[in-house]
Amino acid sequence: GAAFSEFDRSKHVVEPFEVPYNWPRLRAADYGYSSPSCVLWGAVDWDGNIWIYRELYDKGYTGETLARIINALEEHDPLMQISVLDGACWSKHGTGPSIAETMIRNGTRWIPADKNRIPGKIELHRRLAVDERTDEPKLKIFSTCTNLIRTLPTIPLSKTNSEDVDTKADDHAYDALRYMCMTRPTGLPQNSIFNQIKKDSFQPADSVFGY
C-alpha cells in the first residue's frame, strides 16, 4: 500500500504566495547524477509549520553545476538558516573532492542530513497529520513543486520492512523532504526549535572549508 495515504491535495497543496522575508528558510537536497537530484526549499512560519515553496528536480548535474543553479535560484532569498545534504555526498571517490566539497567550494553551504530512515518517516507522518487545534497540517506544499506532489502519494511501503518505504521507488523528493523534516522535530517547544536554528546556522558543515 501507499506509505503516505494521509496525503491530500486539498489539505497539503496550496497556491504560491510571497513568502514573508522574515520566515526562517531551509534547504534540503538528495543528490543524484544518473538518477534525479532533488533540492527542496522550505520556510517556517511562526507557528512552526513548514511551507515547501520551491523544488529543483533533474538529473545529469555535477556538484559544481548544481551549486551554480542553486545560487541563481536563491539570488533574492534571505540566507538559508539550515541546509542539509545527503551524507553520502561527503564520501570521497579517488583523490578528488567529494560532491559536498565541490558544492561548498561553489558557494552553497551544507551540513550532513540526518539519514535515520524510520524516525524521518515518522516525523513526516507527524507533519502531514491534521492538527486538532487548527484543523490544518504542519506541512504545506506550493502547487509549483510538481515532482514532490507527484511522487509523495505514490511511494509504496517496503515489502520487507513495513516501517519503511520501498527504496526502489521514485523516492528522491521524499528523501529531501525527510531530511528537511528531521531538522524541525515537531516534538520540540517552539523556542527550542528556533534556538536550534541559530545553533545550526553557525555550525561548520565541513572542517576543510569552514562552512
Predicted feature residues:
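Acidic, Mg2+-coordinating catalytic module of metal-dependent nucleases/exonucleases
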Residues: 167-189, 193
